[in-house]
């Protein structure tokens, strides 16, 4: 059904267009994609004629800084946190909307001699800033375009355009397959691009391994660093996990207030202890402790969210009030650590279906969801109910 990443790379190097699809549980969309370095008016015209979506230019942070491209909004509330900058036209264009002038703007965006003052704002080209680490950090079209450009040895920038059907509806996989056949275009998935990158590179480094006796039993503690940020993560491993059988795994995001201080606002501490105890009972398993405090927003922002909850907001509303998504956690680094440990098939200790989807998007297989429900307390009943109602957690309250 889909083409190999290597096939798409060969076409992109020749200046051709490919179709890139994301996960059905995400946007479930396909975009035309070409290398910005080889963009022509003809390619732009093809995209806007047959794609009908918005023409965007995924770039690295370096381009945005050099050209002084500020974020489009101060607080990004997009559900996928797409990092739009201000839209631009090159000063040499007139209206900036024609295929020729849009191609000119893109070409000048890549010109190393260009400066921020060389572009009018707003305009008709929409730059998007890709996250460092690409699809291993965020499985979006923005990151896919920059990754593909880099894999081609080209300037790290792409041109993308969503594909919309003639009736105005979004093109899904059956429509995209027909489109690819009609125009003889290679079609790939972001999932396959993730797998390709995972096969060829890694972002985590195993730094140190020790024996760690705990109140729950003795584990091997393995410390990891990563090349995306300064966060350090730790895996507690019990027994022989190299047999190829599904392994009991808990991916636990750091919660200082719950894990260390025993906060009753959440169930994190009891979940951590219960997971360690269950792994010890089974004699085999992994607890991966990820430094993603407050579902990824950090300790101080979590405390600010708690303050808003005291004023009547729930946990999701508090995050959004602070300008964050409900859940900012990233599973790419955790997935790489689990792969480094030799794991492929997981029995995942979780109540969160999104965690399952997040890990499976990185070439891991969750063979079983193992519930990890703790008794509710008066102080966290509302919090847990919100996780059920708004975050889709599987709890019996």
Swiss-Prot record:
Reactions it catalyzes? D-ribulose 5-phosphate = (2S)-2-hydroxy-3-oxobutyl phosphate + formate + H(+); GTP + 4 H2O = 2,5-diamino-6-hydroxy-4-(5-phosphoribosylamino)-pyrimidine + formate + 2 phosphate + 3 H(+)
Q: Where does GTP bind?
A: 250-254, 271, 293-295, 315, 350, 355
Residue numbers binding Mg(2+) 2: 27, 141
Pathway given for this chain reads: Cofactor biosynthesis; riboflavin biosynthesis; 2-hydroxy-3-oxobutyl phosphate from D-ribulose 5-phosphate: step 1/1; Cofactor biosynthesis; riboflavin biosynthesis; 5-amino-6-(D-ribitylamino)uracil from GTP: step 1/4
Q: Which InterPro entries match?
A: DHBP_synth_RibB-like_a/b_dom (IPR017945), DHBP_synthase_RibB (IPR000422), GTP_cyclohydro_II (IPR032677), RibA (IPR000926), RibA-like_sf (IPR036144), Riboflavin_synth_RibBA (IPR016299)
Instruction: Name what cofactor the protein needs.
Output: Mg(2+); Mn(2+); Zn(2+)
Q: Which domain of life is it from?
A: Bacteria
A molecular function annotated in GO for this UniProt entry is: magnesium ion binding
Q: Where is this region: DHBP synthase?
A: 1-199
| GO BP, one annotated term | riboflavin biosynthetic process
What segment(s) does the record annotate as region GTP cyclohydrolase II? 200-397
The record's EC number reads: 4.1.99.12, 3.5.4.25
- List positions binding D-ribulose 5-phosphate: 26-27, 31, 138-142, 162
Which residues make up the binding site for Mg(2+) 1?
27
List the residues marked with site Essential for DHBP synthase activity: 124, 162
Q: Describe how the cofactor binds.
A: Binds 2 divalent metal cations per subunit. Magnesium or manganese.
Family per similarity comment: In the N-terminal section; belongs to the DHBP synthase family.
- Protein name as catalogued: Riboflavin biosynthesis protein RibBA
- Gene symbol of the encoding locus: ribBA
